Amino acid sequence: MFIKICGITNAQDALDAVECGADALGFVFAESPRKVSVETVREIVKQLPADVLTIGVFRDHVSQDVVNTVREACLVGAQLHGHESAQQVAEVMAEVNWVAKSVVAGSAEASGSNNYGTEMILVDSANPGTGTGYDLSLLAQLPKMINVILSGGLTVVNVAESIRAVSPWGVDVSSGVEFSPGIKDRLKIREFITNARAIG
């Protein structure tokens, strides 16, 4: 089970997440209480093991800006969390090793997500980063043969049940393992990962 801890804002939370077993860390460059600077992310990434997947989260940024930020922050991948077109996704994929496109559960974009050309589709609620969930039955509309990363409203309490319900390729959590926006709770991270791995 692929596990991404998103909304990392400081080195201690990043190191804690990695020590607890996270596969990937997300750094938000879109407007958000968890928004970070390129300089901050670069300093955090320097302290991480080389095998950790580091991902920049963007919303409706120009494709070249995404590519430039990924490079400047020394990241591996990009998560496109806005209204990016298939062409914009392709432009980023041509320059960045790992790219995921986010779609809102139940949306037309979700049902046509195979048109984006990326194997990674992150399914979220309409209000990302708020802890808001959605009806998991909406995932039935997704095209087959796509690696689905489940996000939106996941917590230590419901992650195992959610994985059982839809068998995603991975899970992504932000607010569900926080004290407050941008400040992670190490104990919740550990419990979340333990519960997720117990199923997947």
Task: Identify the residue ranges that each predicted region occupies.
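Conserved N-terminal beta1-alpha1 strand-loop-helix module at the mouth
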Residues: 1-200
